[in-house]
């Protein structure tokens, strides 16, 4: 669970910015987007193959 504590003199905007950055670093947003719709096993396999080719 991602958690950000707001300091006494810290604005809500800066705390929200830190929270969003932390979510991005933890990969939570990418995970949510990936699970937004059902992905067939064959599509998942094809996506992983494409990613591995992209890395090389």
Swiss-Prot record:
The keyword NADP does not apply. The keyword Ribosomal protein applies. It holds the Pfam family Ribosomal_S21. Keywords: Ribonucleoprotein, Ribosomal protein. GO terms for molecular function: structural constituent of ribosome. One of its GO terms (biological process) is translation. One of its GO terms (cellular component) is ribosome. NCBIfam families: S21p. Belongs to the bacterial ribosomal protein bS21 family. This is Small ribosomal subunit protein bS21. It comes from Dictyoglomus turgidum (strain DSM 6724 / Z-1310). The lineage of its organism: Bacteria, Pseudomonadati, Dictyoglomota, Dictyoglomia, Dictyoglomales. The gene is rpsU.
């Amino acid at each position: 669970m991602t958690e950000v504590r707001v300091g006494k003199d810290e604005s809500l905007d800066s705390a929200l910015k830190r929270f969003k950055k932390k979510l991005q670093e933890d990969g939570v947003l990418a995970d949510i987007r990936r699970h937004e719709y059902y992905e067939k096993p064959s599509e998942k396999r094809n996506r992983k193959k494409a990613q591995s080719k992209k890395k090389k």
